[in-house]
Amino acid sequence: MSGNMDEAVSGNMDEAVSAGKDVRIARWVATIAGLLGFVLSVSIPLLPVTQTTATLNWPQQGRLDNVTAPLISQAPLELTATVPCSVVRDLPPEGGLVFGTAPAEGRDAALNAMLVNVTETRVDVIVRNVVVASVNRDRVAGPDCQRIEITSNLDGTYADFVGLTQISGEDAGKLQRTGYPDPNLRPAIVGVFTDLTGPAPQGLSVSAEIDTRFTTHPTALKLAAMLLAIVSTVIALLALWRLDRLDGRRMHRLIPTRWRTVTAVDGVVVGGMAIWYVIGANSSDDGYILQMARTAEHAGYMANYFRWFGSPEDPFGWYYNVLALMTKVSDASIWIRLPDLICALICWLLLSREVLPRLGPAVAGSRAAMWAAGLVLLGAWMPFNNGLRPEGQIATGALITYVLIERAVTSGRLTPAALAITTAAFTLGIQPTGLIAVAALLAGGRPILRIVIRRRRLDGTWPLIAPLLAAGTVILAVVFADQTIATVLEATRIRTAIGPSQEWWTEKLRYYYLILPTTDGAISRRVAFVFTAMCLFPSLFMMLRRKHIAGVARGPAWRLMGIIFATMFFLMFTPTKWTHHFGLFAAVGGAMAALATVLVSPTVLRSARNRMAFLSLVLFVLAFCFASTNGWWYVSNFGAPFNNSVPKVGGVQISAIFFALSAIAALWAFWLHLTRRTESRVVDRLTAAPIPVAAGFMVVVMMASMAIGVVRQYPTYSNGWANIRAFAGGCGLADDVLVEPDSNAGFLTPLPGAYGPLGPLGGEDPQGFSPDGVPDRIIAEAIRLNNPQPGTDYDWNRPIKLDEPGINGSTVPLPYGLDPKRVPVAGTYSTEAQQESRLSSAWYELPARDETERAAHPLVVITAAGTITGESVANGLTTGQTVDLEYATRGPDGTLVPAGRVTPYDVGPTPSWRNLRYPRSEIPDDAVAVRVVAEDLSLSQGDWIAVTPPRVPELQSVQEYVGSDQPVLMDWAVGLAFPCQQPMLHANGVTEVPKFRISPDYYAKLQSTDTWQDGINGGLLGITDLLLRASVMSTYLSQDWGQDWGSLRKFDTVVEATPAELDFGSQTHSGLYSPGPLRIRP
């Protein structure tokens, strides 16, 4: 018996010794692996990388041919050039361009590029509009001159005429070497261009070292450190988990039982998210982010494609690399936005299954609270987080962090806290607004610190701290995977210097934008923040006033409010102040709504007066939301009701109705205060659950807006219809935008008749119209601006008058590539005495209309200019002068009988040349002829009109015309709507030369994409303006003729050139290496 007892005691002692040994091992493993993971992670930004180098050398293949090599950084690291003086001797008397880094005829070439030019008397070296050297041509052509050596680098730009000395001034007798020690004088390079022809002469060379500092990949050492850092961190977390288990508590289920319960709220929220995913609006920067993702693989890194000289997104933006991987499957919106849908579902599952129960049994058991959480989540998520912007992912990361912190607090374990730290770090690595996750960490900091202090007596300090350090720094293995600390600091310097990079004290701008009646402050975009604030502050007052509220967990509630307040604080330090950042509040706003619903319910807030006051607040918030337009970004706006006006019902603004109701509720609350009544069945009914009712109403409004848009737009473009067509291979807006490949095709044939001096266009007796009746500088779809604007068309630089008059004697340059030798023009503009002007053109034969003809030729178009009466989606009916299309049928005797007129769709802008659209669906099938009826009855010189003959254009879709292979500069606003077009790629510091440009509507292009992509800010227009000539093409949105969808421009080269062949190499550098600051200043 005693032997058995001895054996049992011995066995227990052995188990204890073994357990103690395991604990000691776990402590050492946690400490060593944690510190190793931490040290390796923080060393990764400093470890070496291999850089791909690229050099542009010219001449190529021994020929003096023009070559293109547009640098995304615009300026090289270094340029050296040697020009033998014999080249100058051999030039013709008028001279010419020896070489330039941009075509001499390119827009602002002298202002940006290097030009070595020879005139009749001088040899000039001009760099960025600075004369670096200017020497008499006879001296350079003389026998003493050997060669011209030019260098441009960080030390400055200099030109040395070897063999010559200066003949005057203080430096007379010294070498003929001049220049400036300015690193910003390095020229922009889009290639090498010359007037020279034939074989390359001996000694002529141009060599540019391209800035490829961001084109790097990790060395074997760095790759090993990254892998070991990740593995060490995982091992440290497993060891920490082993130490956590020493508390003897049974581990919670990974997925608790409550997760398996499905309710009606789940159905509404999940169904709403799914429907919105298909038909809903997208976010503002979707095109921007998608094109970054689409070009990343070819570039070798995630470049900020549209601005900042191609610098990388790091240290923020690892999420974009996920999208880059997804583009290997498809670029379609329905696929590429899938992370947002997944995050939306995760947010709801965590809210309903984890967060609400943690807030207390009163919240978890309240159906109204559950509805409030779901509907506020929906209402806040829908306007912001249905695209590619990362606010949805950040909101999810912050919620996961909060849930993990709460699990750490309830369990007393640190593994959930370590995972929360990792989650917060990765959330912060998405964008600076990821600070909301850091806010969740800080909100739970004190209870976590208590756990560490309590546990350190048993486990020691380092076994607990080291895994947390590794968990917080392992993100560096992702952020600095292919970049170094030097390149990331340079990218940050560039973004900060160019901007936008607003100071913390300008945070008021975010809220200012929110209250403006613009798309940034539209009805839907106000919901997230104002509903969160509406729930936050009353809850705060309740929690401060009452120390104990039955069924509400104070700790989690305070931490939730702390997250929201900390987020509002941290948002002050983000570099931009856009309202789309309010999408961060979607998840925590839903949780706050659930808590507030309980706190202001009749069971908790007994005062009828106070509940009525809160109802007044809810109604006021609704009034504030509706005191704006129902606007949405870009194509999401198509078909939405009240998308450019304040919503009304029966002529009364909805905002005014809610404001009146709010005032009534406030007066009722005041009456309850005076009468001191505490109970009222009517008040109880009205105040039972105002938050979910208000949120549900806003969700219905948003859903209805998009559903109405789909119905109105069908069968042309809407988000919903495009997403459905994507399953059958649809190409978004490219399927619905129609383009005229040649606007000279399709002009109608005039019927025989007696014509006046203007020919068939003028008819028999035109009054006040003349062939030259158009002001100077009237071009297609643009208005003259006093300040230079990037991205403008070549039409601005063409001669004001034609050298050779057109078919009817006009000297007016025509838009859209119209040929003056074939297309007449008549206008009423005059600087002399004004008169009433009238014109009825000859009848033009209208093609017979059948089903095939109806589909192939849906429009009659008149290219016109001036102030014209017409309709558009954006502006409704705009009054001006008359340019109608009159149609005629055959009478009993076969003569033409006028049968009616059609007023045009005119999308503007006024008074530019544009295409007036007359749908053939508004012309009866039996009409056989049409004519132009134009009247300018105004005696103001500013009111004038100009017209060309009618045409039935030959149309192709953009997808048919542009296709998927030609490189296209798609402005940042349009990329998601054109998933099948090929963006212009870049690699090794050089971009492709685009063939086309696709832009958003006129005002978005003018105010957003043209300015954002300006070359002075490191944008792509700095390349195209120098290298190419843009011409706008005639385009229309099918079946939505009054919609300004945007514009398509065709690029033509200034001079013929072929893509340059680059010389590649590789170099290995430490993480601290920098070739010097990238030139970002003019």
From Swiss-Prot:
It comes from the Bacteria. One of its GO terms (cellular component) is plasma membrane. The keyword Cell wall biogenesis/degradation applies. Its EC number is 2.4.2.-. Its main location: membrane. It is a multi-pass membrane protein. Changing I289M: Resistance to EMB. InterPro entries: Arabino_trans_C, Arabino_trans_C_2, Arabino_trans_central, Arabino_trans_N, EmbABC_dom1. Changing I289F: Resistance to EMB. It is an enzyme of class 2 (transferase). One of its GO terms (molecular function) is arabinosyltransferase activity. GO terms for biological process: Actinobacterium-type cell wall biogenesis; cell wall organization; response to antibiotic. This is one of the targets of the anti-tuberculosis drug ethambutol [(S,S')-2,2'-(ethylenediimino)di-1-butanol; EMB]. EMB is a first-line drug used to treat tuberculosis. EMB inhibits the transfer of arabinogalactan into the cell wall. Belongs to the emb family. This is Probable arabinosyltransferase B. It comes from Mycolicibacterium smegmatis (Mycobacterium smegmatis). The gene is embB.
